[in-house]
Swiss-Prot record:
Alphabetized GO MF terms: methyltransferase activity; transferase activity, transferring alkyl or aryl (other than methyl) groups
Family: Belongs to the class I-like SAM-binding methyltransferase superfamily. CmoB family.
Reaction equation(s) it catalyzes: carboxy-S-adenosyl-L-methionine + 5-hydroxyuridine(34) in tRNA = 5-carboxymethoxyuridine(34) in tRNA + S-adenosyl-L-homocysteine + H(+)
Residues reported to bind carboxy-S-adenosyl-L-methionine: 88, 102, 107, 126, 192, 196, 311
Enzyme Commission identifier(s): 2.5.1.-
Disulphide bonds in the chain: none
Name of the protein in question: tRNA U34 carboxymethyltransferase
Keyword Zinc part of the UniProt annotation: no
Keywords recorded for this protein, A-Z: Transferase, tRNA processing
């Protein structure tokens, strides 16, 4: 059982207190339903060695370490490999380098210089395995709550969390839609790599805004295309082999949508092409990756002939 009472205590006296007191029941019900692979992943978690870090670095990466022997490291590696595939990272856990599909540290280095997270209460929507949540804590956040319905990501988060005492980060295996409306309790809300999967992009922006306190900050990272404020790509079918991609606006169009949704001080702080060095297959993620989704003769296009992935980071205030 995952005990959420520390989260309820952390949020006592905040606008999120009432919601926090409902989460244990909601999580327990979700755990009862379970998932077909949950038992296998739980076995991997149970196989993790029972050691404590003497070195913790969440600021310059994600590294936990202590003096341990080769046998312990081998046990750690086998258990972590049992939670494959690992998408977001990398993680350095007691001498085991988890070389994830994504170099998420590169994205964080593009995003974090534009943010002040010290003392902030943060919501990370579509948090994956929680890599960015740990980096947010490293940047001084007061507390971070991530929501993502993927059970494997939930278990990967638990693998790291068990080695950190009172980490002030919680992964809830819920879809964003399960959050109640008008929470208005977070200083900063992140939505990274989620927006283009939404069929109703403006509704997503409004829902994100409802989670923020007045004056709070949204950090939105999503796929974009070149063009003016009227330019939006809607794929006919797949985009980079993904079926669930709906809207890829230009940066000016996205900024317009944010203003229309009621955000102010809207600014684009980064635009970057996604390269096959940043997203690729590894021994920790052995399935297809970006190189398989691009035109083999022209990496400026996807395999469908559409513009290759380009990502923008937009920051805006409520």
């Amino acid at each position: 059982m995952i005990d959420l009472s520390p989260l309820a205590r952390r949020l006592a006296g905040t606008p999120l207190a009432e919601w926090a007191n409902t989460l244990q029941v909601q999580l327990d019900k979700k755990m009862e339903k379970g998932h077909g692979d949950l038992e296998r992943w739980q076995s991997a978690l149970d196989a993790l060695p029972k050691i404590q870090p003497t070195e913790v670095d969440l600021l310059d990466g994600l590294k936990l370490d202590t003096n341990c022997d080769d046998e312990t490291r081998a046990q750690m590696r086998t258990a972590l490999m049992g939670l494959s595939p690992w998408r977001k990272g990398p993680f350095d856990l007691f001498g085991v380098h988890v070389d994830t599909e994504w170099r998420s540290d590169w994205k964080w280095s593009r995003v974090s210089p534009h943010l002040d997270l010290k003392g902030k209460r943060i919501l990370d929507v579509g948090c994956g395995n929680g890599y960015y949540m740990w980096r947010m804590l490293g940047a001084g956040a007061d507390s971070v709550i991530g929501v993502d319905p993927n059970w494997l990501f939930f278990c990967q988060f638990q693998a790291v969390q068990r080695y950190l005492s009172e980490p002030n980060a919680w992964h809830l295996p819920f879809p964003f839609e399960d959050l109640p409306p008008n929470l208005e309790g977070f200083d900063t809300v992140f939505s990274m790599g989620v927006f283009y999967h939404r069929r109703s992009p403006i509704e997503h922006l409004l829902a994100l805004k409802d989670c923020l306190v007045k004056g709070g900050e949204l950090v939105l990272e999503t796929l974009v295309v070149e063009g003016d404020k009227h330019q939006v790509l809607v794929p006919e079918d797949r985009y980079a082999q993904m079926r669930n991609v709906w809207f890829l606006p230009s940066v000016p169009a996205l900024e317009l949508w944010l203003r229309r949704a009621g955000f102010t001080d809207v600014r684009c702080v980064d635009v970057s092409m996604t390269t096959v060095d940043e997203q690729r297959g590894t021994e920790w993620m052995k399935y297809q990756s970006l190189s398989d989704f691009l035109d083999p003769d022209d990496h400026s296009k996807t395999i469908e002939g559409l513009p290759a992935p380009m990502r923008a980071v937009i920051v805006a205030k409520k």
